């Protein structure tokens, strides 16, 4: 719903919208912000109505907070089919992936889709294996693209009046680099993306190093998208 006065003031499906600057700093794929932000929506039983909410790290990771809270909500029905979509600023760590996998095994009627802005410590084998385990358990994991950023802006952000169509358009290259690395994780290949951060001055460097196995198993169109083929 387009609005010249910003988002609808009273949205019964959304508990809290985040501010534009929060969305920009949390979901910028170039930033290595420590905190994690979760935007999520829940659809029960194939209904058209969707329940939306936002969450950030507390003493636990946002994924664990969600799982603990989800099963205690009054609307939770363990025998009703439920579709959950997460938009995460960081991918789940290995421990969170294990908690999610265990949760899904206990609740077979739940389907989970995860869109991520960045890969969390992607060279850590525990995190890489955790993502593969999630996919093996039926979770769909994708890097956020322009479509997801635009969707989140319209549905989760307290955007300024007449700015419904605006969202922080990040360079496509960073998105493509994460897409390439996620593909390596899924295939069980060594990391090809390296991220270096200097404190003085504060700069972040993204580099790609490909081995023979990468050229052999990664589809050419993914390499072309990053200018590597």
From Swiss-Prot:
GO CC terms of this entry: apolipoprotein B mRNA editing enzyme complex; cytoplasm; mRNA editing complex; nucleus
Alphabetically ordered keywords of this record: Cytoplasm, Hydrolase, Metal-binding, mRNA processing, Nucleus, Zinc
Enzyme Commission number: 3.5.4.-, 3.5.4.36
One BP annotation, GO: response to gamma radiation
Essential cofactor(s): Zn(2+)
Catalyzed reactions: a cytidine in mRNA + H2O + H(+) = a uridine in mRNA + NH4(+); cytidine(6666) in apoB mRNA + H2O + H(+) = uridine(6666) in apoB mRNA + NH4(+)
Expression by tissue: Expressed in the spleen. Expressed at lower level in the kidney, testis, lung, brain and liver.
Cellular localization per UniProt: Cytoplasm; Nucleus
Domain CMP/dCMP-type deaminase, residue spans: 10-134
Entry's cofactor comment: Binds 1 Zn(2+) ion per subunit.
Residues at which Zn(2+) binds: 61, 93, 96
Main location: cytoplasm
GO terms for MF: cytidine deaminase activity; mRNA 3'-UTR AU-rich region binding; zinc ion binding
InterPro entries: APOBEC/CMP_deaminase_Zn-bd, APOBEC1, APOBEC_Cyt_Deaminase, CMP_dCMP_dom, Cytidine_deaminase-like
Cross-referenced SUPFAM superfamilies: Cytidine deaminase-like
List of catalytic residues: 63
Function: Cytidine deaminase catalyzing the cytidine to uridine postranscriptional editing of a variety of mRNAs. Form complexes with cofactors that confer differential editing activity and selectivity. Responsible for the postranscriptional editing of a CAA codon for Gln to a UAA codon for stop in the apolipoprotein B mRNA. Also involved in CGA (Arg) to UGA (Stop) editing in the NF1 mRNA. May also play a role in the epigenetic regulation of gene expression by participating in DNA demethylation.
Subunit relationships: Homodimer. Interacts with A1CF; form an mRNA editing complex. Interacts with RBM47; form an mRNA editing complex. Found in a complex with CELF2/CUGBP2 and A1CF. Interacts with HNRPAB. Interacts with SYNCRIP.
Entry-linked PANTHER family: C-U-EDITING ENZYME APOBEC-1 (PTHR13857:SF26), MRNA EDITING ENZYME (PTHR13857)
Family: Belongs to the cytidine and deoxycytidylate deaminase family.
Name this protein carries in UniProt: C->U-editing enzyme APOBEC-1
Organism this protein belongs to: Mus musculus (Mouse)
